[in-house]
Amino acid sequence: MDSKKFGEFIATIRKEKGWTQAELAEKISVTDKAVSRWERGLGFPDINTIKPLADVLEVSVLEIMQS
């Protein structure tokens, strides 16, 4: 996974849903700072967060992993 592409993917879907970083963070029980780091390409979510993230964004885990 490319962290920059991953971050852009997450940010695009989040914005399409009209959510703030804080709203997405609350839905998956992480901090808004974590979401910010991901979206800026500075890291990835913990493996245990990938499935909940995919679920709330309504995408497959595969789509997230390929982003």
Where are the regions a protein language model picked out?
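A short, Lys/Arg-rich alpha-helix, primarily the initiator
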Residues: 1-16
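Short, flexible micro-motifs
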Residues: 10, 44-46
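Residues in the recognition helix of alpha-helical DNA-binding motifs
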Residues: 13, 27, 38, 67
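Short alpha-helical DNA-recognition segment
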Residues: 18-37, 43, 52, 56
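DNA major-groove recognition helix of helix-turn-helix/homeodomain DNA-binding modules
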Residues: 48-63
